[in-house]
């Protein structure tokens, strides 16, 4: 049995990435303060449909995701359908795979096209760190349920008497891994120590990311894939990512204190992605349908893979596990790739993965391979800057990576690109695209 992955439908049509779009990414409580993930999702999908000049009724499926769930609208995909003029009967469902969520939604739509169930679909993801579901303590939640069942005044009073003042305080969303209690930043510190990633190297990667992102924006290369967003009260608009340090200097990074291990740590706020708001979307079609409608796709999906490892140690190594699977399924080696886009959740995480890509020992002991995945050529790596600069709205990042690498390959005359990301829960995702 061949290890090659056939990312086609029964007619032999490839899965076309027709176009992609995102909102600008904004730091928490700035330009999108008060704007929900759902509203950003509707905004970007509406604009995607408008720019592609496609009748919304043509969309047969929408798969969309968010990581920070909205209790009021748990099926964000269905709400987007209802808010964007699509046919009321359009199939829509929501997914979540932590920071790889829009990788998952893209694959789900692609697989629907591969099976022949649909010809046209939209995938994507949205997250808000500014509109959060603020919870209550477990004791108060338990009491509120009991209160709903209490019949007499005395029973209700007894419930209130067992609550202390601290039980009434609001509980913000958890930032720690449920299984381990470790935050992502603590995991990044863990990885920096395990793989001997220096503070200087982390600072250098962050500086590189911001510098390249600044150059990319100033060149105009992101204009076609980032929309201008107008949000209430409509007194201003945002048309550019606002986390990028346009005057980044390597000296400024050295002044920052460690953020997660104050005494012995090396991971700082500048070498970590900030809490970010934003949304993204990708229009996918079967190759023949795209051409029949007159589109020139920005790329095609060649292969994809997901992975999972233990969460207790270095759980953000997902790219090192998912990438070799995607490469094998594409019949390729790392050196065959034209460009590599890796999510920079933390500089330490990205550098640890890059280091292990080149490690034969890691390949033998962890992957069961005889040779290393390969050494990453920095002339191919995150050439437009990465998440450290652009920011990271959890569910939107995967679609940003896919769209960005396809458009850059198009500008370079074609080739193949790897997009890969780590995710909470020890998860990893990788997708290889080809561009003509």
Curated annotation (Swiss-Prot):
Tell me the CDD domains matching this sequence: thiolase (cd00751)
Cellular component terms per the entry's GO annotation? cytosol
Pathway assignment: Lipid metabolism; fatty acid beta-oxidation
Localization per record? Cytoplasm
Record keywords: Transferase included? yes
Which InterPro entries does UniProt cross-reference here?
A: 3-ketoacyl-CoA_Thiolase, Ac-CoA_C-AcTrfase_FadI, Thiolase, Thiolase-like, Thiolase_AS, Thiolase_C, Thiolase_CS, Thiolase_N
Give one Pfam hit by family name. Answer: Thiolase_C
Entry keywords, A to Z: Acyltransferase, Cytoplasm, Fatty acid metabolism, Lipid degradation, Lipid metabolism, Transferase
Q: Its catalytic activity? A: an acyl-CoA + acetyl-CoA = a 3-oxoacyl-CoA + CoA
Enzyme Commission (EC) number: 2.3.1.16
GO molecular function annotation: acetyl-CoA C-acyltransferase activity
Active site residues of this protein = 99, 392, 422
Which GO terms of type biological process are on file? fatty acid beta-oxidation
Record has Flavoprotein as a keyword? no
Enzyme class comes to: transferase
User: What is said about its interaction partners and assembly?
Assistant: Heterotetramer of two alpha chains (FadJ) and two beta chains (FadI).
Question: Which family does the UniProt entry place this protein in?
Answer: Belongs to the thiolase-like superfamily. Thiolase family.
Q: Which HAMAP family match?
A: FadI
Role played = Catalyzes the final step of fatty acid oxidation in which acetyl-CoA is released and the CoA ester of a fatty acid two carbons shorter is formed.
What is the name attached to this protein's record? 3-ketoacyl-CoA thiolase
What is the species listed in this Swiss-Prot or TrEMBL entry?
Shewanella woodyi (strain ATCC 51908 / MS32)
Which gene holds the coding sequence for this protein? fadI
